[in-house]
A protein has these predicted regions:
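Soluble or luminal CAZymes and related metallo-dependent hydrolases
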Residues: 11, 15, 49-52, 131-135, ...
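Short, charged N-terminal beta->alpha structural module
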Residues: 5-21
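Non-catalytic C-terminal accessory region of glycerolipid acyltransferases
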Residues: 2-7, 134-260
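A short, well-structured juxtamembrane/interface segment
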Residues: 19-44
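A generic local structural motif
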Residues: 30-35, 56-57, 112, 137-138
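Catalytic core of membrane glycerolipid acyltransferases/transacylases, capturing the structured
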Residues: 42-129
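Residue-level detector of flexible, active-site-proximal loop/helix-junction positions
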Residues: 39, 75-77, 131, 196, ...
Length: 260
């Protein structure tokens, strides 16, 4: 039986991504308003975020204040045929509710070619729903040891992407527990909410998994606590907020300075 390949901490070094990055930057050129409730952010931390459809990960890659390694669907690390099928059938049709047809198939086929370069540049590692999750946890520990934060999107998006999250999977809880078992340190976990449509990013104060372990909560219950906190950020700071316009605010500040 062939030995399974060990995952390495991604460096983000990719010549193709350097070529593609200006396109990504143009697509997400509208800088979000960052509401930082946490103050100075730890470099070594876990971050749990909503996905904001396909837009959250690239937007956070560009605008989150700390360097991160990200968890991504393992299907996106397969061959071109597997990536195309996943993007067409799961991502576009099932989750984004796009109509099946040649346009959706062509879009999936084209983006499946670009995906490996983008994933590599964004420092993504594959995550799994089976025993192979151990590989993801192992490489995530190595990333934390290198003072990189680990950004995880734990929402259950099987029925699509929604503003209000219905469930968090507990993989991030397992990572925090593993770090605590190895290092004796209760690593900070930052709940955040990203709205690409309104151009708002909210970063909450860190929470700590061991606080809830001591209360007798299991992994799934702890994951629900964090899910509720992320939803709370949406209701408090995003739901009724107007679309943020960075350029308009910049002009207004410039005008205010001149008038003084």
């Amino acid at each position: 039986m062939a030995k399974s390949k060990e995952l390495k901490v991604p460096t983000g070094k990719s010549v193709m991504y350097l070529i593609l990055k200006p396109i990504v930057q143009f697509a997400y050129r509208k800088k979000p308003k960052i509401i930082n409730l946490a103050g100075d952010l730890e470099k070594k931390a876990i971050i749990v975020s909503n996905h904001s459809a396909m837009s959250g990960p690239p937007s956070l890659e560009l605008y989150y204040p700390v360097k991160t390694v990200k968890w991504g669907a393992h299907e996106m690390f397969g061959n071109h045929k597997a990536r195309t099928a996943y993007m067409r059938d799961i991502l576009y049709i099932k989750k984004k509710h796009m109509k099946p047809g040649w346009k959706t198939s062509l879009k999936a086929w084209l983006l499946a070619w670009l995906n490996p370069f983008i994933y590599k540049g964004m420092k993504n590692v594959p995550t799994y729903t089976d025993a192979r999750l151990g590989k993801t946890l192992k490489v995530s520990i190595k990333a934390l040891e290198q003072d990189l934060s680990v950004l995880i999107f734990p929402e259950n998006s099987n029925d699509g992407y929604f503003d209000v999250l219905t469930q968090f999977f507990p993989g991030f809880v397992m990572l925090a527990e593993r770090w605590y078992a190895l290092k004796g340190e209760d690593i900070p976990v930052y709940p955040i909410y990203i709205s690409v449509s309104k151009h708002i990013l909210v970063i909450d104060k860190p929470m700590y998994v061991q606080d809830y372990v001591k209360k007798g909560l299991n992994r799934y219950q702890i994951a629900e606590v964090f899910k509720d906190k992320v939803n709370d950020l949406y209701f408090k700071y995003v739901k009724d907020a107007e679309v943020y316009d960075y350029k308009a605010e910049k002009k207004a500040l410039k005008k205010a300075k001149k008038s003084k």
